[in-house]
UniProtKB/Swiss-Prot annotation:
Known catalytic reactions: 7-carboxy-7-deazaguanine + NH4(+) + ATP = 7-cyano-7-deazaguanine + ADP + phosphate + H2O + H(+)
Lineage: Bacteria, Pseudomonadati, Pseudomonadota, Alphaproteobacteria, Hyphomicrobiales
Organism: Rhizobium johnstonii (strain DSM 114642 / LMG 32736 / 3841)
GO biological process: queuosine biosynthetic process
Gene designation: queC
Lineage: superkingdom: Bacteria
HAMAP family, sorted: QueC (MF_01633)
Entry function: Catalyzes the ATP-dependent conversion of 7-carboxy-7-deazaguanine (CDG) to 7-cyano-7-deazaguanine (preQ(0)).
Binding site for Zn(2+): C185, C193, C196, C199
Family, similarity comment: Belongs to the QueC family.
Cofactor: binding comment: Binds 1 zinc ion per subunit.
Gene3D superfamilies linked to this entry: HUPs
Pathway membership, UniProt: Purine metabolism; 7-cyano-7-deazaguanine biosynthesis
Co-factor requirement: Zn(2+)
Protein name: 7-cyano-7-deazaguanine synthase
Amino acid sequence: MKTIVVCSGGLDSVTLAHKVAAEQQLIGLVSFDYGQRHRKELDFAARCASRLSVPHHIIDIAGIGGHLSGSALTDNVEVPDGHYAEETMKATVVPNRNAIMLAIAFGLAAAQKADAVAVAVHGGDHFIYPDCRPGFIEAFQRMQNEALEGYASVKLLAPYVDVSKAAIVVDGEKHGTPFSETWSCYKGGEPHCGRCGTCVERREAFHLAGVPDPTAYEDQDFWKAAISRYSATEVR
């Protein structure tokens, strides 16, 4: 299937891009500038597109993002430290973000006669982000079937929606994903902070996957305390 991957430049979506390149016909990456403080992730998406020799579309929706106020990812709100399973991480929710991005991605796919749009939502996102859950994926597909009826047939691929981030790391290793060429940290500094939810989740995923983590973290050990109250299953 001719597929466009929604790629932020993070570990999950870059791994998905490599997976699609190996298993489908990757025809492009689409990224979104929504005014996120960690905008540097877009540079990593661009590198991925160059590496896989496909076009990279960066869609500027910062004007919209500016109205979706209250999120630590877009506003002058402190990004919380800790595990993703903590209530404080709800500060990182950007309301309706995936619905907005996917609607644009589907329009792009229809215009380019693509067969599918692929998105890297995963099981670890379910607790905090409602637009990463299976119910949302299924409902969005039904909505797009109606929206594009008679014009295009575009499938929403979400191969990681029911698996852990550790499983994504394993899949990334299988497909040769250069993990050092991905960006996760929500604080957007240099290097990864090692303390925000996405840094903790990234560090934990490599540990559970049994794959060496090439990432430099400002705080190398915070993740151990952050995950101590939560259980996870090793994937291999």
